[in-house]
Amino acid sequence: MPQNKVLSFPLPEGTLLEDITKNKWILGKQLGSGGFGLVYQVSCKSKEIDCVAKIELKESGGLFCEINFYNRVMKNKTSLDTWMKEQKIDYIGIPSFHGFGITIYKNVEYRFAIIQRLGRDLENILSEKEKFNITVIKKLAIKILDILKFIHSKEFSHGDIKAGNILFGKDDDKVYLVDYGLATKYSSNGKHKEYTINPKNRHNGTMAFTSIDAHKGVTVSRRGDLESLGFCMLKWYSGKLPWEKYEKEPENVQGMKEAFVNNISKKTIPFKNAGIIYNYIKVVTKLEYEEAPNYESLKQMFL
């Protein structure tokens, strides 16, 4: 995986970006930062569209991976429409992708991607509420499982499921999963990657929610994304995770997660009304590395 480097300085408001299809975009105010890049409000010179620009140093790896994901997964509108019809859903919870390119500022090359602008993320909401009730978590789980089913059908895993990467649309009924900087092909043309430990990739992702496979340096497969979602739901419901205070000790976090899933019971999740989360984590952590999950069965747990 390409290495990320921190953006040296922000690009000024008003900077003109030209993507590979010659569409021109004008940077507005900086909206935030994530990972190793910056996020800006952006406007298109030729059409009215509400987007953001994600910008990183050209040699950074995250945005390169994200652009690759969008180009492979989100470009074929016919395929997207067919999927929605087959699944009986009215949207796919992945931001629309509008362009990408390279720009130069002060003799430094930057990579950029133009992506649909969304609303608030769950992390922001949790900073005010601390916890979600089980009704909210059920609704979120169903929507995120729909998104993961689609991503996994394209032979990609997300690799970084967390509240900060889950956003509401302008319509609060719509939920989106963002940030595909760690998205990985777990399979190619139907041939699943073998379970192989790569020490260089150990502990990738966000420590509190990283799957056990990712802790070991194994490519995240479908079960890894589902496991991370389980850890997220536990955090959203209880307000804490047993390993939270050890996040700077990845080996310790890994050991605690392994002990947790190997001995999972209602005693290890001692929160009232958390039985659904308990059952979900129990099911997904028993999946084999290459096993295709039954997404509809998982969704039924939350209905």
Swiss-Prot record:
PROSITE patterns: PROTEIN_KINASE_ATP (PS00107), PROTEIN_KINASE_DOM (PS50011), PROTEIN_KINASE_ST (PS00108). This is Probable serine/threonine-protein kinase FPV212. Residues 25-303 form the Protein kinase domain. One of its GO terms (molecular function) is protein serine/threonine kinase activity. ATP binds at residues 31-39, 54. Its EC number is 2.7.11.1. Pfam families: Pkinase. The active site is at residue 160. It catalyses: L-seryl-[protein] + ATP = O-phospho-L-seryl-[protein] + ADP + H(+); L-threonyl-[protein] + ATP = O-phospho-L-threonyl-[protein] + ADP + H(+). Belongs to the protein kinase superfamily. Ser/Thr protein kinase family. Poxviruses subfamily. Keywords: ATP-binding, Kinase, Nucleotide-binding, Serine/threonine-protein kinase, Transferase. It comes from the Viruses. InterPro entries: CK1_Ser-Thr_kinase, Kinase-like_dom_sf, Prot_kinase_dom, Protein_kinase_ATP_BS, Ser/Thr_kinase_AS.
